[in-house]
């Protein structure tokens, strides 16, 4: 603050914001926003009931905001100066580097010989594969929000919908009783189909199953023992040297 300046620039902005005459804070021995925030909000309001009146709380809030901003700027400048000082102490050996550095650069083909074999496609880059399949994003979000409460959707709806009798007793059923059981299962819609779908693991001809799910017309799993075939039909990539266990249990339909 200049010697001829009685009020700091930050405090002048507070005066403008609350629409009081310029320099009025100096008359009450407030020359900067830090003079105001040294007091608590309640202390400042009680000590200045006569002139800011109902604007005392707003005045203190504005002064605190200005003080926080000044403090952040001071810390940022201090950190910047320290970084610059550290960099100046670090010796620059750039002039000692070999003038033939360009000729010694290792080529990309030598550094990453695997790039030519990688399959860079949209699915491989952008497709998000959850760790638990099948997945249903809206259901996952609901379960995440209920994780810390240890309640199910059934519990919430049963407490808010008294017109549903099937929540009162297991012996009562209604048009939505199946819906109530689905809510209590904590399974997503796709997961609920797994225990109810027909079991065809004992069928002698699984051609339809493999053609529908893996896109290859075959009666058994043996073609998928080849890693390239298995990865291609599932549209996935396997890292160099990677393996996939495609035994009978992996490629057979689940029981």
UniProtKB/Swiss-Prot annotation:
Pfam families in the record: VRP1
Domain of life from the UniProt record: Bacteria
UniProt KW keywords: Plasmid, Virulence
Function (record text): Not known. This protein is involved in the virulence of salmonellas.
Family: Belongs to the SpvA family.
Name assigned to this protein: 28.1 kDa virulence protein
Origin species: Salmonella typhimurium
The encoding gene: mkaB
